[in-house]
């Protein structure tokens, strides 16, 4: 398996572990269609890795909805979106360093419209971050950027 920027594989003879924190923006500026598209992107990542994708799925607006761990598509499917306030990206990175120190994700994928101030890159603590944006207007100052069409 080729190792990419976001998907570091931890591999033994019979096991590959890919650990990603997916955070979906559920702020008031995100429509139901946008949230559904973001959720579908996460499901697509799980499907792409044939069940070998382990991770957490969380939601955020101005607060973190605690990420839920999943190790299978069935576990992923029972996680439901919550939120609806403003948007704060910094709380994601603070959450990771406060609550996930025992098992840091190999990467963080933030699915958002990007309409909020961006935190300083140093807060990521060296963890690769992908901003998965649903528009062409916003350009984060750091991390990798990908776009989805809604």
Over which residues does each language-model region extend?
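Von Willebrand factor
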Residues: 55, 64-69, 73-110, 115-117, ...
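Conserved beta-strand elements of the Class I
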Residues: 21-22, 109
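Acidic, polar low-complexity linker/tail segments
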Residues: 1-21, 30-33
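Residues that scaffold, gate, or flank divalent-cation-dependent active/transport sites
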Residues: 25
């Amino acid at each position: 398996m080729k190792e990419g920027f976001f998907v570091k594989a931890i591999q033994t003879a019979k096991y590959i572990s890919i650990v990603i924190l997916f955070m979906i923006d559920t702020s008031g500026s995100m429509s139901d269609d946008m949230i559904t598209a973001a959720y579908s992107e996460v499901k697509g990542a799980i499907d792409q890795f044939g069940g070998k994708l382990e991770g957490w799925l969380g939601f955020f607006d101005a607060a973190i909805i605690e990420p839920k761990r999943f190790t299978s598509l069935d576990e992923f499917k029972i996680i439901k979106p919550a939120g609806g306030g403003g948007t704060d990206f910094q709380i994601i990175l603070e959450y990771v360093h406060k609550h996930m120190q025992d098992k840091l994700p190999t990467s963080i994928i933030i699915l958002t419209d990007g309409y909020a101030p961006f935190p300083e890159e140093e807060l990521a603590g060296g963890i690769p971050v992908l901003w998965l944006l649903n528009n062409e207007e916003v350009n984060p100052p750091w991390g990798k950027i990908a776009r989805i069409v809604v």
